[in-house]
Amino acid sequence: MLRRIALLLTGVLLLCTLSFAQERTKINDKAAGNKLLGRHMLSLQWISWDYFGRVNVTNKGGVYYLKGEQKGRGNTDFVRVEGVITRIDAKEFWFDGKVTTQVSHINDGMPCVRDGEDIVFRITGKRKYWRMTEIDNPCDAVADYVDIYFR
């Protein structure tokens, strides 16, 4: 009887664990997936195009994670990205996570958070970076250019 209960509990725990597991990143272009892995420069134009931040993309069990930050020099400005890449195509990737910006002259210097599942970064033309496509700042009437550069 105890054995049956133990097996039942083990099965329930396993099912719960699997239901909360992150789905693997859907890679529709292997070369683009490889290009995205590793360390990249990160920028928000309000902070600097001279002093870049860093973002790191890792693959853990088939799930691509993105995390990084650019900080202003001599102030509290920053852009921070963190989350999971859900899909990778040849010229764009989809991101499920947070993009937080804080710039002294925007939104009264308070943080502005974009939190969502379908944040898209895209390569256009001959650019050497992925740019976040939703450039309209949801907290103020400005455009944010959040860029992740090729290695």
Description of each model-found segment:
Residues 71-72, 98-106, 134-141:
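Short, solvent-exposed aromatic-acidic interface loops
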Residues 95-125:
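An anionic, turn-rich surface loop/hairpin at beta-sheet edges
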Residues 1-9:
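Bacterial N-terminal signal peptides that target proteins for export
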Residues 8-17:
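Bacterial N-terminal signal peptides
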Residues 59-61, 85-94, 121-127:
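A short, structured loop/turn motif at beta-sheet edges
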Residues 22-84:
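N-terminal secretory signal peptides
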Residues 79-82, 88-90, 127-129, 133-151:
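Edge beta-strand at a domain terminus
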Residues 64-68, 93-97, 128-134:
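Short hydrophobic/aromatic-rich beta-strand segments that constitute the beta-sheet cores
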